[in-house]
From Swiss-Prot:
Name of this protein: Cytosolic Fe-S cluster assembly factor Nubp2 homolog
Residues annotated as binding [4Fe-4S] cluster: C188, C191
Assembly behavior: Heterotetramer of 2 Nubp1 and 2 Nubp2 chains.
Binding site for ATP: G14, K15, G16, G17, V18, G19, K20, S21
Cofactor stoichiometry and binding remark: Binds 4 [4Fe-4S] clusters per heterotetramer. Contains two stable clusters in the N-termini of Nubp1 and two labile, bridging clusters between subunits of the Nubp1-Nubp2 heterotetramer.
């Protein structure tokens, strides 16, 4: 039930553990901060982390005549969330499903959730280019996907996988909105100086190679990590941080390509 959704953005990563879900949740919160109504769909069936990151674990989803009702983060209902994590009794419960069952669940998430009118739907995907991604692209053909944001870390081993992700996007006809380099440097929580602990500028170099925008470079900032488990936006808590600056830039980028 995506008829009421104006803009659909897919967040991808070639490798797991690069902070894609953190980027997805904080981007959703940043869009809400800018006055938009936002939906966040977590289709990482085997590693759903969005409920934890937003402090929504233990919340229930319900069925209505129109389908599943998403979980709202507050009474304003400006951020709606759907994740398989809400269907699991325990965060440690594994999802042991073969491909066809995963495909069926993702189709349900995309067609049977009662999203109200949304300015943006952010889809947080699992890493890689698997059945889940193909299913998403097939389901979005009718309504259209407005683009993908690819998250990477600066190490070469991660960049190799992102090159595959870029090829996947081109073959499936997804517009790449840009690349975000995450975990580039460590911000000292005391003096806030940033020190590179991995290689640097890998995301920018890859964006140049692929001829797509480089949306920004996010450091490892312990102050951002503390926000996990809440619906607090970096824009509110750390407005002068590099993370807030990059998120603001991405929001402005989305405004330029969005359907109003």
């Amino acid at each position: 039930m995506l008829e009421k959704v104006k803009n659909i953005i897919v967040v991808l990563s070639g490798k797991g553990g690069v902070g894609k879900s953190t980027v997805s949740t904080q981007l959703s919160l940043a869009l809400r901060k800018n006055g938009f109504k936002v939906g966040l769909l977590d289709i990482d069936l085997c590693g759903p982390s969005v409920p934890y990151l937003l402090g929504l674990e233990g919340r229930d989803i319900f069925q209505c005549d129109e389908g599943w009702v998403p979980v709202y983060t507050d009474e304003s209902q400006t951020l709606a969330v759907m994740s398989i994590g809400f269907l699991l009794k325990n965060r440690e419960d594994p999802v042991i499903w073969r491909g066809p069952k995963k495909t069926m669940m993702i189709r349900q998430f995309l067609t049977d959730v009662r999203w109200d009118e949304l300015d943006y739907l952010i889809i947080d995907t699992p890493p890689g280019t698997s059945d889940e991604h193909i299913t998403v692209m097939e389901c979005l053909k009718e309504v259209g996907c407005h683009g993908a944001i690819i998250v990477t870390t600066p190490q070469e081993v991660a960049l190799d996988d992102v090159r595959k992700e870029i090829t996947f996007c081109k073959k499936t006809g997804i517009n790449i909105l840009g690349i975000v380099e995450n975990m580039s440097g460590f911000v000292c929580p005391h003096c806030t100086s940033c020190t590179n602990i991995f290689s640097s500028n890998g995301g920018a170099s890859l964006a140049t190679y692929a001829q797509v925008p480089h949306l920004g470079t996010l450091p490892i900032d312990p102050r951002v990590g503390v926000l996990a488990g809440s619906t607090t936006s970096v824009l509110d808590e750390l407005p002068d941080s590099t993370t807030a600056e990059v998120l603001t830039h991405i929001v402005e980028k989305l405004k330029t390509i969005s359907v109003s």
